[in-house]
């Protein structure tokens, strides 16, 4: 399991976990909501990791590439 903590104060996202064995991405929001997305390619987690390191918008990437595009489950 790979975990990224988002420390940017303007981000609504607190943490992103990626399980490469299951290809599952879990997104945890600062307001307590959490969702798991299925069949996520490793390239998406790599890009999210890069965005976190560069302090760029993870939320924008998730909105454009993950949310409403992959099967999900509310946690």
Segments from the language model and where they lie:
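Acidic/histidine-enriched, beta-strand-rich ligand/metal-binding domains
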Residues: 1-75
């Amino acid at each position: 399991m790979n975990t990224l903590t988002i420390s940017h104060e303007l981000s609504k996202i607190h943490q992103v976990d990626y399980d490469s064995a299951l290809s599952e991405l879990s997104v945890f929001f600062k307001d307590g909501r959490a969702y798991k997305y299925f069949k996520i390619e490793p390239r998406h987690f790599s890009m999210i990791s890069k965005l976190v390191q560069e302090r760029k918008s993870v939320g924008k990437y998730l909105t454009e590439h993950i949310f409403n595009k992959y099967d999900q489950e509310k946690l």
